[in-house]
UniProtKB/Swiss-Prot annotation:
APOE is an apolipoprotein, a protein associating with lipid particles, that mainly functions in lipoprotein-mediated lipid transport between organs via the plasma and interstitial fluids. APOE is a core component of plasma lipoproteins and is involved in their production, conversion and clearance. Apolipoproteins are amphipathic molecules that interact both with lipids of the lipoprotein particle core and the aqueous environment of the plasma. This is Apolipoprotein E. The modification Methionine sulfoxide is found at M145. The gene is APOE. The keyword Glycosyltransferase does not apply. It comes from the Eukaryota. Its main location: secreted. Residues 269-320 are annotated as: Homooligomerization. Residues 281-293 are annotated as: Specificity for association with VLDL. Residues 1-18 form the signal peptide. GO terms for biological process: acylglycerol homeostasis; cholesterol efflux; cholesterol metabolic process; chylomicron remnant clearance; high-density lipoprotein particle assembly; intermediate-density lipoprotein particle clearance; lipoprotein biosynthetic process; melanosome organization.
Amino acid sequence: MKVLWAALLVAFLAGCQGKVEQVVEPELEPELEPHQQADWQSGQPWELALGRFWDYLRWVQTLSEQVQEELLSSQVTQELTALMEETMKELKAYKSELEEQLSPVAEETRARLSKELQAAQARLGADMEDVRSRLAQYRSEVQAMLGQSTDELRARLASHLRKLRKRLLRDVDDLQKRLAVYQAGAREGAERGVSAIRERLGTLVEQGRARAATVGSSLASQPLQERAQAWGERLRARMEEVGSRTRDRLDEVKEQVEEVRAKLEEQAQQMRLQAEAFQARLKSWFEPLVEDMQRQWAGLVEKVQAAVGASTTPVPSDNH
């Protein structure tokens, strides 16, 4: 009899332990690397649109089970689609803006950079589409399990969304790196333009000297000092004009670079705060469930121990 009780107890405890581990699993979310947290920083329109996409998805996920089942409908999928299209539209617009700044760069370099950026853009779009597909799949499974417990489905959805979130972070990191290469190419093109102006200016100076020598020999009747002064004034005016254009172009490039950097830093801070808020909400979602399961587990163990102790207590004998 004792052997039978022990076997039943072991089987029961093993089943309870498996269930507890299955429910607790969604809470275990790995910490993000520092560079991944920094990726959600920047102030470009496409990154702000991506933030709205993820905020909407997080809003759906944090609702109660009943409200969540009501919202997981075709309307939610349509709204996610609209946010995805907005993100990709803003990203294409920003890419076109950078391509305009790459005009001085060689055609081969422009083609290579454009191809790499398109690949990163496609990966981001595919991962966003995967998020929408996972949500639609969850909706179908919930509808198929009406009247049954959906804790396992919610845990599985949370696990999928956590993995997809990390993939989105990697996509944003890759895109920002590609865009940084674009910006570097724009600066390189501007520097090449300045070098060309300097070379042209040097050529003009040499031509001016040669022409001055020729004119000086042909106009020997004019006073030498008067001719040199007039030619020097014309050359000085020409050099000042070219130098002014060069400075204006350099200032314009510097302003554009500073503006892009400021936007990147601003969005980086926003993305980091969003990531921290998302992590805090996930923790607050699953923490009460874990504590409740632990209390139930402790009570169950006490009851089983009490039952086993009662069954093994020897019965007093009436024989003296």
